[in-house]
Amino acid sequence: MEFSNVERVSLPKMLVASYEVTSAEPEQTATGFVENWLKNKGLNVGENGVRGFGFDCHKGRDIPEGCRTYHVYYSVPDNINGDPEIQIKDFAGGNFAKLTIHDPFSGDFPSGWGVLLKWAFDNHVDNLLGCTSPDDCYSFFSNEDTPCLEELYWNKGEQYMALYLPIR
């Protein structure tokens, strides 16, 4: 597992298919469900601009013990309609600090969030989470208003994960 240097990026406003799952391991369930839904619409992640993002989303919610809520956004073209389980909504985009991780599942990829937070505080970059030190930020990670996004993708047969921390 390797971390890149942190960089400032802007994610564009985009139309997204939105879905969330609450369970002990919600990431695989949420991503699998939406990726299958996309395939049924003739769309595949990584093709024709379709990108997938996920984030924890449990702040202020009553979640059963041992569970987490994970929310996913997948960018979609304007002509896609949702259904009872998938909402189509606007993602506002914005400014983010981005850390890319090569081969993220070969190590402790969540430690990348600490790298991003340390970079933001060391460089006096305002994060949009509302935390005042790296140590108190983790409780702010999980809301839809200022999501800390994870994006998995492949490049030349290698897997990567980009972590996005919302900043001013």
Give residue spans per PLM region.
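A solvent-exposed interaction/effector surface
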Residues: M1-R168
